[in-house]
Amino acid sequence: MILVVGGTGTIGSEVVRLLQEAKLPFKALVRDAAKARELNARGVQTAAGDLREPRTLPAALGGVDKVFVVTPLVPDQVQMRAALITAAKTAGVKHFVMSTGIGAAPDSPVQIGRWLGENQQQVQESGMAWTFVQPGFFMQNLLMYAQAIREKGEFYMPLGEGKVSWIDARDIAAVAVQALTKPGHENQAYPVTGPQALSGAEVAAALSAAAGRPVRYVAITLEQAKQAMTGMGMPESLADAMNELYALAPPDYLAGVLDTVPKVTGRPARTFAEFAKAHAAAFGAA
C-alpha cells in the first residue's frame, strides 16, 4: 500500500491520477474534509492526517509500505517533512519517495535547496530505502500568470535573458510513480528537466502559438518580483528564497537538459509547446 502525501497539489494530483489509472493500491493523506470527499467521489481512498499534527500520522500509515511526499513552499516545510519521515520510519515503511529539487543538498548555495537537502539527509539516515525526484521549474507555474496573459498579453518574471529547462509536472509524477511501483529505483536521486531550455521570449512564443494571440515576456527585477510575491501574501523569507532561485536564471544555471525522464519512464519528456497547447484555453485561446 502506497500513501500519497500532497495528493491535491500540482505534482501529487498527477501521482494520484497515475496510480488510479494503474489500479494500484494507495491512499491519499488529506487534512481537509471537503478535499477528502472530493477524492472519495472519484474513487480515491483517503486517510485523515496533517503533517503539522504528528499524532495523526501513525493511523494514516497503517498498512503502508511506500510513501510519496511533496510539500508546498511554506515556512515550516522542513518540520512538516521531518514529522512524516520520523512517523514513516516508526511505522516500518520500506521505501520513501520524495519530490525535492535540482541541486537539493545540505550545502546547497540556495536556501530552498538547503531546506530540501536537510530532509533528504534525514531520509538517507533513516534506514528506509529512498528515491528523490529533483525537478527544476515547473511549466505549470506559468498558470499563475494566466489571467495577466489573457487580459494583457504579458507575463512578468525575473529571469533576465536566461534560459530555463522547464519540466511538466506530469513528467515529475511519472518518474515518481515508476520509483514507487517498479524495482531498481531504490536509493537513487533523479534530477529531472524538460527536453529543452527556453528563454522568456521563447516561452512567450510558445504561449502565443497556443493561445492564437501575441504574448510577451517582460523581464522584471528581483526587487519587483519580491514586491509581487509579498503582495500576494508570501512571507518575506520565502520570497527571498524564491529570488535566490530566480537569480540563477540569467547565468543559465537553470538551463541544463537531462534525459532522466525518458530513461526512467520510457517516454520523452513533454515539450513546453505541448504544455502550452494542453492549457491553451487558460492562456486565452478562443
Curated annotation (Swiss-Prot):
Top-level taxonomic group: Bacteria
Pfam families linked to this entry? NmrA
Which InterPro entries would you find in this protein's record?
Answer: Ergot_Alk_Oxidoreductase (IPR051604), NAD(P)-bd_dom_sf (IPR036291), NmrA-like (IPR008030)
Query: For binding NADP(+), which residues are annotated in this chain's numbering?
Result: G6, G7, T8, G9, T10, I11, R31, G136, F137, F138, M139, Q140, N141
Q: Under which EC number(s) is this enzyme classified?
A: 1.7.-.-
Q: Which GO terms describe its molecular function?
A: oxidoreductase activity
If you read the UniProt record, what top EC class would you report for this enzyme, in one word? oxidoreductase
The residues forming a coiled coil are none
Keywords in UniProt for this one? Answer: NAD, NADP, Oxidoreductase
pH dependence per the entry: Optimum pH is 6.2-6.8.
Q: What is this protein called?
A: NAD(P)H azoreductase
Q: Which family does it belong to?
A: Belongs to the NmrA-type oxidoreductase family. Azoreductase type 3 subfamily.
Per the UniProt entry, the dependence of activity on temperature is:
Optimum temperature is 41 degrees Celsius.
Protein purpose: Catalyzes the reductive cleavage of azo bond in aromatic azo compounds to the corresponding amines. Uses preferentially NADPH rather than NADH as an electron donor for its activity. The enzyme reductively cleaved Orange II and carboxy-Orange II, and can also reduce several sulfonated structural analogs, which carry a hydroxy group in the 2 position of the naphthol ring.
How would you summarize the oligomeric state and partners of this protein? Answer: Monomer.
The source organism is Xenophilus azovorans
